[in-house]
Amino acid sequence: MKPPSLPLLLLLLHLSATISAAPSLSPTPSPTTSPIPPHKPSSSSSPLDPKQLKALESLNIPTVKDPCNHRPTTKSTSSSVVTCDTSSPFRLVTSISFTNCSTDLSISTTALRALSPSLTSLSFLNCPSLSPPPRLPDSLHSFTAVSSFLRRRNGLSGVFLARLVNLTDLTVSSVPVSTSGLFVILGNMHEIVSLTISHANLSGNIPKSFHSNLTFIDLSDNLLKGSIPTSITLLSNLKSLNLSKNTISGDIPDSIGDLISLKNLSLSSNKLSGPIPDSISSIPELTHLDLSGNQLNGTIPRFISKMKYLTHLNLANNAFHGVLPFNASFIKNLEVFKIGGNSDLCYNHSVLSSKMKLGIAQCDKHGLPLSPPPQKEDSNSDYDYGNEDDTSEKKKEEHHGPNKVVLGVAIGLSSLVFLIIFMILLAKWCG
């Protein structure tokens, strides 16, 4: 009997081509991770001061091993980090940071007295059930309290904080502060450099004067009222000013331009009115400008597009009018740009594309909005080139998806046709 060489050969060739055309799945290599070197305690010839060692024990800080080299293994459990100096004959504690404090922790005056005067930094993070001690050491240069001391309704008092006259860094956030005014706290802090009192129910007016050493001020999310004092512009070293989420009113002072070291200016969610002062153009390295959620009016000044270091610009939800004076290249260079919620503001369609989704209407030939834009800025109206690219890529994937399905069906049908032809030829040959 003569074998069916031709049909069989055709079938084998076709099946071989089909298999080779199918996508191959190579085994995924197992991920490799470089081993993390174990923490090596720093060697020191001096033991820790016995009185301070006893003080750490009373604060529930482990002392079986050297507490100065102890580091917590997880972030979810109660932990403490102690830093010591290298003095002799005994080392001394310089810094303690408590995180997720246990409910049985108590900060005694006796322990703090033993740790003073070497203790210069004290931090409490997420210690809501903790009660503040009657007094903190005068030696402190840095004090931090975040989401802590919430057992009392009043949290921390202004007098309690005002005693820390040697502070250079004060951070109080999500902790109520009861005081008749910010000046009570800052009056004698002549060395203060960084000041944060945010989300603290702080009320009253902004002080008319600040200490000249300040480089960072964050008084956001409080109940501060009144106007921005012109004297704040005497802070020539100030790099960041955040007064957002208060009830501050009045104009932005023209002298704001005297803050020549400023990089971040956040005045959002207040009751500020008037135009954007031209003096802001005198701040050479401003990178973050947020004036959203106010009652600012007038036209948006052209000088903003000349600020070469600007990366974040939010002017949303104000009362600006006229034609937006920015071109596409300026907007593309910004990481964040929000302009919606200005019903009388519009853009020139010959300069900017509608695809940019700015949240404002297109201008007519008279420079007026063609249609009413959204009343409030929507988070989806941010101009983001990255999102636009992602969308186009998804469209490409959706476009190419059906082609792969059609190709698979065609290969399957052709295989079936060859099989039928082979069976017919085989039947004829056998017959």
Swiss-Prot record:
Effect of loss of the gene? In snc2-5 and snc2-8 mutants, impaired basal resistance to P.syringae pv. tomato DC3000 leading to increased susceptibility.
* Pfam families cross-referenced by the UniProt entry: LRR_1 (PF00560), LRR_8 (PF13855)
Q: Which GO terms describe its biological process?
A: defense response; positive regulation of defense response to bacterium; positive regulation of defense response to oomycetes; regulation of defense response; response to bacterium
Q: Where in the cell is it found?
A: Cell membrane
Q: Which UniProt keywords apply?
A: Cell membrane, Glycoprotein, Leucine-rich repeat, Membrane, Plant defense, Receptor, Repeat, Signal, Transmembrane, Transmembrane helix
- Enumerate the Cytoplasmic topological stretches: 426-431
The region annotated as signal peptide is 1-21
Membrane disposition = Single-pass type I membrane protein
* Induction text: Induced locally in roots by the nonpathogenic, root-colonizing rhizobacterium P.fluorescens WCS417r.
Q: Provide GO CC annotations from the record.
A: cytosol; plasma membrane
Which sequence ranges are listed under topological domain Extracellular?
Answer: 22-404
InterPro entries per record: Leu-rich_rpt, LRR_dom_sf, RLP_Defense
Q: What is the effect of changing G204R?
A: In snc2-2; reversion of the snc2-1D mutation leading to the suppression of constitutive defense responses and subsequent reduced resistance to H.arabidopsidis NOCO2
Effect recorded for G412R:
In snc2-1D; constitutive activation of defense responses leading to enhanced resistance against H.arabidopsidis NOCO2
User: Where are this protein's LRR repeats?
Assistant: 161-185, 189-211, 212-235, 236-259, 261-283, 284-307, 309-332
Positions of region (Disordered):
23-50, 367-399
Residue ranges spanning the membrane: these are: 405-425
- Stretches of Pro residues bias are at 26-40
Glycan-linked positions: N100, N166, N201, N213, N242, N264, N297, N327, N348
Give the family from UniProt. Belongs to the RLP family.
Function, in words: Involved in plant defense. Required for basal resistance against P.syringae pv. tomato DC3000.
List the PANTHER family.
OS01G0750400 PROTEIN, RECEPTOR-LIKE PROTEIN 51-RELATED
Protein name (database record): Receptor-like protein 51
- Gene that encodes the chain: RLP51
